Amino acid sequence: EGEHGEEEHEDGHGHEEGPTVFSNEATELSVSLDLSSGERIRRVVLNHAMEEISIIGEEAFMAPVDSTETTLGFFSSDDVGFATLDIGLRFDQIERDGFIAEMHHEEDHDDDHDEDHEGDHDEDHEGDHDEDHEGDHDEAMEYDPFSFSDEVFSAAATLRRDLNEHASLSLGLASVSKTPSAVELFMNGEHLASSRYEVGDVNLDTERSDNIDLAFTFDSHNWFGSAAVYYNRVDNYIYLRDELEEEHAAHMDEDHEDEHGEHGDHGGLILSEYTQQDADFTGYEIEVGARFALPRGEFEVTLGRDEVDAEFTDGRAVPRIVPARNMLTARYTLDDFSAKLLVKDVERQTDVAMGETVTEGFTLVNADASWSYGFNDSTRLTLTAFARNLTDEVSRNHTSFVKDQVPLPGRNIGVRVRLAF
């Protein structure tokens, strides 16, 4: 495995291999046992997965990682008289075997060698000498094997009560563990898709999220809707932290003093490191709608909004959080024909983390119209016309690392034909 890691580096170091190839080979075995009896639901699931992730080519920013994950899960659902109680339990055993990549600086010639040849060339050959020894200071990536393993337990329970035949109320409690991914542990290199030099951390701890949510739903005749609020307390929340400008300047000064400035610059990319910190997430989702029976067909309109606030326990904002959104959907159906109009208003995101910039709000207007025809019970033809971003508005996704360089797509109009048989 160590030799394989070196081969990945040698391919990526020269930047001459062509396109990057992301390989993810996985083998998974799952066994499910249903122990239900009558209205009492009992299920047990055992899942075993082996996965190998490798990245080869010019953008080979992570040595191969082998992961083994074994999961034992249990689910039950019972009518406890005044409500329905759902319980889920899960035990995970995770092991990831990868490599820690570190940059190693080498000199091709020692000082004694240089002194012996100091006078061998006259001034006419000084330029040639400099060119011949331009690569005396080489940078090589060294790989040391490392294994991460952990055993974690998660539990969730939901109590759901029907208030009447049209409305219900549910309360959910959960404590969920998430081990660091292969990327979060072993990433080390240029990730051109995000314009960053990303660095993982093999010392990351397992995340634990303690959650509570309350939801209300109703569907009465022509009116329907739902509302939910939630609070998540995440210990050891894992995220990518961008290097600040002043930190970059300080590192560049240090690298200049050490005569290794090229490495400190990271090829002009932003240095972004996986790190973790305790965080709180609070949010809500609300939707209300109405149906109208027309002389021909049915018309439905829905209005919704969602918003989340995420802060670290020291009061700083969590980076790349989705801004508040308002959505209006109108849908018309008649037999095999349907049409939909979606207006999505994304608000300005001003609650930004250190190093982030404010993202302006935008409004997207999308439309679809489709007609289908069934030739028989198993064959159906569907013709769809669609339009995205009808107003051709410039819009940027606040959660994207490259929001300033790559805006969301502009106006897009097209037709799709689908034949299912």
Enumerate the language-model features and the residues they cover.
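C-terminal beta-signal and adjacent terminal beta-strands/loops
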Residues: D235, T350, W371-F421
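Gram-negative outer-membrane beta-barrel transporters
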Residues: Y230-V234, E245, H251-Q349, T391
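Residues on the lipid-exposed face of transmembrane beta-strands in outer-membrane beta-barrel proteins
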Residues: L29-S37, L72-D78, A157-R161, L214-S220, ...
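Outer-membrane beta-barrel channels and translocator barrels
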Residues: S36-R40, V80-A83, D162-H166, S209, ...
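Transmembrane beta-strands of outer-membrane beta-barrel proteins
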Residues: R40-L46, L85-L89, L169-L171, G225-A227, ...
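Surface-exposed extracellular loop regions of Gram-negative outer-membrane beta-barrel proteins
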Residues: M50, Q93-E107, D136-H137, M141, ...
